[in-house]
């Protein structure tokens, strides 16, 4: 795997790590230069709106975290080194355990991302959050269920 591919994959994994730690501002900061698609027919949003959305929707438990593990798998990373651009398609599975909820998968879907390299560093340029494929018991994770 090239150095660029490792750096991009680490952005995918860092997102999951921050979200699972309950660090929503840190998670949103990964997208400070990105446009984010959260609705099939709506406009894209920026990092500030993403933080507002997650802050309103994601339940935090007494420990300050959502008590989840976002497992990012199967990243297919395509890089144009000369243009300083890349795309990635990956799967996610969200596991959760909480008081009253045994450890189980609660959601699965896909991320389609675009990246740009600026001053030698890769960063998110775009994320599509609309590719939500399967839902389990989301009562302990979200304050409201996702559409679709």
Annotate each PLM feature:
Residues 24-92:
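A solvent-exposed, acidic/Ser-Thr-rich amphipathic alpha-helical stretch
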Residues 1-30:
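Short, low-complexity N-terminal intrinsically disordered segments enriched in polar/charged residues
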Residues 63-148:
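A beta-strand edge to alpha-helix "cap/lid" segment located at domain peripheries
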């Amino acid at each position: 795997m090239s150095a660029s591919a490792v750096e991009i994959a680490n952005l995918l994994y860092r997102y999951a790590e921050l979200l699972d730690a309950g660090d929503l501002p840190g998670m949103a900061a990964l997208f400070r230069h990105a446009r984010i698609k959260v609705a099939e027919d709506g406009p894209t949003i920026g990092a500030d709106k993403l933080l507002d959305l997650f802050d309103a929707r994601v339940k935090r438990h007494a420990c300050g975290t959502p008590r989840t593990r976002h497992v990012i798998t199967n990243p297919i990373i395509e890089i144009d080194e000369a243009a300083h651009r890349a795309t990635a398609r990956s799967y996610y599975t969200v596991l959760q355990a909480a008081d009253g909820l045994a450890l189980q998968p609660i959601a699965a879907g896909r991320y389609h991302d675009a990246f740009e390299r600026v001053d030698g560093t890769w960063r998110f340029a775009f994320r599509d959050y609309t590719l939500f494929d399967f839902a389990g018991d989301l009562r302990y994770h979200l304050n409201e269920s996702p559409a679709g």
